[in-house]
């Protein structure tokens, strides 16, 4: 791999960080763009002025047109942020104005059980829209102390929009399902930007109106703006049917809802959704397949209604659709926010994530690894990360320079290739100091501007990020080990709640996945996440991401998709090492069939699962200091390149066991130096930084 030393020392703008600039200096915007370049930034993320009507105000559009013209004249690439406030989709309230029917909706369940005959009368409350469905079922009380609903005895019950009158026999239960707006207690009411009500991301008409009001006017006012932009940045569109604060209890446990869902469910599965509704709220393991199917459908619908629709519009106007979604860190948030976040992310042109815990000890390593999987499925050159040191800013502020260095390395070793940043600089050192007090965003909407970095620090950070981006451009992590992405286990166990708690059973897959992931990282091992679709592909080709897969590790699951199990059986027979950590699954995710896998597969401890024989792959060993993370790549001229990253606070020493005296090129993205060395030596990896080693022979 031939490296241009001058290019490595001064990497191109496309690889450097882009600050989030929501507000520009009123009279000195062109000069401020020069300040951004002077501080080493590569471009910006910006938007139509968000106050005074957002895109409905011609003055805002005219001002944005002038900013875009100045950006193009200054040579600064730009991304277009698509919202006024947060989250994307509301248009600062424009979208729902005069169209309240497009608001996010949830379905709640009212349950009435009787053990003696009685008449039931029910009337809808003032917060709800209408009754959607009702049915009664027999209850089996033959087992002492239990009341088991017999779902096969379902009898629909007549109802009007707002009332029900029904005769219940002994040992019957009546389920009433009602629709209401999904707003109170949601992320709409607990964020730093607004209290706006929000659209239903399951409804393509709502998303179309968002396009009509917040995309079309921008293109009309600034023709070609989306074609000239790097991409659109959409910000955390999501369902609002779950609660986010532990100190709040609400009378409604909400299921995401939209009128088209029953028809889509029938198209996808050939089943009637209505009789399954009780199983989505409660019940034993017999209910798990209904939930897996429902939440898979939800992910599909959001992916098409929101992401694919916006992506297609952007493509039609010569642009790309990107941004990030809510709660990338935990699978339970993948389910309750999107049904299956992966189904939504993979519809992007360029997936993304955000990082809130921007210090190495607080960093969530699974976040980037999950999005890395989406980027691989999209076929994109990595993905975007929005760096937001908003989670515990006091901790970040203890050593902001080192913390951001470590965070950037952790991002890029996991697949990030573009960085948008809320880690702001102090621009006092530029020119006559006129930007000393300038704030690039509304602090009431986006939180306090803290100005962590001076000019020298920001130039160094931008150079470091730019050099990593230059070296990793177009390259993917080469891994022989995959970890299974067991989203179906969470889908099966998730039920709507009256508060923000999800329960130990529901979060079990998250915790099991993290135990396995952290054990891999503690061994210095790299890996890829793979879902059921990927396992099927590996069974067909033996490869994922161009690399032969030799080892498949599965976290402790109770539920597994049948196609995943079929692929695992085939791969095990072909000699691939398949290990279940902690326990074997026992439920088929789609049929509910009991699985008996003991004897066919082995459940081992987490530590046993991650012990990979050194002969299987080249692996640097940490001799002293913090464990060094590493990733291996194949360069464009087919050489092996290692990225060695030390996220710790002291230096580390590593060695490649069995290495010979082959020549290698060592690239330090912090200093910009390139040296020629021999491979058979000890290597020092500085604290919170990384180095690259290319084996030349």
Please state what every model-predicted region is.
Residues 1-3:
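Basic/polar N-terminal segments that are highly enriched at the extreme N-terminus
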Residues 7-22, 27-33, 42-49, 55-80, ...:
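Carbohydrate-binding surfaces of carbohydrate-active enzymes
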Residues 39:
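Histidine- and aromatic-enriched segments that form or immediately flank copper-ligand environments
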Residues 46-208:
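Acidic/aromatic-lined carbohydrate-recognition and catalytic surfaces
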Residues 208-214:
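Conserved short secondary-structure elements within globular domains
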């Amino acid at each position: 791999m031939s490296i241009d030393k001058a290019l490595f020392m001064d990497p191109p703008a496309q690889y450097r960080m882009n600050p989030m600039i929501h507000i520009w200096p009123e009279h000195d915007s062109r000069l401020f763009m020069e300040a951004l370049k002077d501080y080493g930034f590569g471009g910006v993320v910006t938007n139509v002025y968000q106050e005074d009507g957002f895109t409905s105000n011609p003055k805002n559009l005219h001002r944005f047109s002038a900013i875009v013209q100045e950006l193009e004249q200054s040579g600064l690439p730009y991304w277009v942020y698509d919202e006024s406030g947060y989250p994307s989709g509301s248009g600062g309230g424009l979208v729902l104005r005069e169209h309240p029917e497009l608001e996010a909706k949830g379905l709640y369940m009212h349950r009435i059980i009787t053990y003696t005959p009685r008449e039931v009368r029910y009337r809808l409350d003032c917060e709800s829209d209408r009754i959607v469905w009702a049915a009664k079922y027999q209850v089996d009380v033959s087992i002492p102390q239990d009341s088991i609903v017999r779902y096969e005895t379902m009898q629909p019950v007549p109802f009007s929009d707002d009332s029900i009158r029904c005769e219940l026999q002994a040992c019957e239960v009546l389920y009433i399902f009602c629709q209401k707006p999904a707003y109170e207690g949601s992320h709409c009411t607990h964020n730093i930007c607004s209290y706006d009500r929000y659209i239903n991301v399951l409804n393509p008409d709502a998303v179309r109106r968002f396009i009509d009001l917040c995309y079309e006017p921008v293109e009309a006012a600034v023709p070609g703006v989306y074609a000239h932009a790097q991409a659109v940045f959409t910000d955390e569109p999501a369902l609002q049917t779950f609660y986010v604060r532990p100190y709040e209890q609400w009378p409604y446990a909400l299921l995401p809802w939209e009128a088209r869902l029953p028809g889509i469910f029938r198209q996808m599965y050939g089943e009637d959704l209505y009789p399954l509704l009780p199983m989505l709220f409660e019940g034993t393991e017999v209910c798990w397949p209904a939930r897996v199917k429902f939440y898979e459908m939800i992910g599909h619908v959001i992916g098409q209604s929101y992401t694919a629709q916006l992506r297609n519009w952007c493509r039609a106007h010569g642009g790309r659709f990107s941004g990030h979604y809510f709660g990338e860190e935990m699978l339970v948030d993948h389910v309750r926010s999107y049904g299956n976040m992966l189904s939504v992310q993979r519809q992007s042109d360029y997936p993304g994530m955000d990082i809130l815990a921007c210090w190495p000890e607080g960093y969530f390593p699974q976040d980037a690894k999950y999005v890395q999987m989406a980027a691989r499925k999209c076929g994109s050159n990595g993905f975007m990360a929005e760096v937001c040191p908003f989670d515990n800013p006091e901790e970040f502020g203890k050593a902001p320079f080192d913390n951001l260095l470590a965070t950037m390395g952790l991002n890029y070793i996991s697949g990030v290739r573009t960085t948008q940043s809320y880690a702001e600089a102090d621009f006092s050192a530029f020119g006559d100091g006129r930007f000393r007090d300038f704030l690039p965003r509304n602090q009431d909407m986006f939180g306090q501007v803290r100005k962590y970095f001076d000019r020298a620090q920001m130039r160094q950070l931008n150079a470091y990020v730019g050099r990593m981006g230059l070296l990793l451009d177009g390259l993917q992590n080469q891994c022989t080990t995959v970890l299974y992405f067991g989203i179906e286990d969470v889908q099966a166990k998730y039920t709507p709640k009256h508060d923000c708690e999800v329960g130990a059973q529901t979060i079990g897959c998250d915790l099991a996945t993290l135990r396995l992931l952290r054990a891999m990282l503690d061994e210095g091992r790299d890996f890829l996440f793979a879902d059921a679709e990927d396992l099927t592909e590996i069974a067909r080709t033996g490869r994922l991401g161009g690399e032969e897969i030799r080892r498949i590790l599965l976290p402790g699951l109770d539920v597994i998709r049948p196609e995943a199990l079929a692929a695992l059986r085939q791969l095990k027979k072909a000699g691939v090492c398949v290990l279940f950590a902690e326990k074997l699954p026992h439920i088929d995710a789609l049929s509910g069939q009991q699985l008996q896998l003991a004897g066919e597969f082995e459940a081992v401890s987490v530590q046993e699962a991650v012990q990979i024989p050194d002969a299987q792959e080249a692996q640097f060993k940490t001799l002293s200091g913090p464990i060094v993370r590493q990733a291996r790549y194949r360069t464009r001229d087919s050489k092996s390149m290692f990225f060695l990253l030390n996220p710790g606070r002291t230096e580390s020493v590593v060695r490649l066991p069995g290495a010979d005296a082959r020549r290698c090129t060592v690239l330090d993205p912090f200093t910009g130096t390139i040296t020629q060395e021999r491979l058979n030596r000890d290597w020092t990896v500085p604290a919170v930084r990384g180095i690259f080693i290319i084996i030349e022979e």
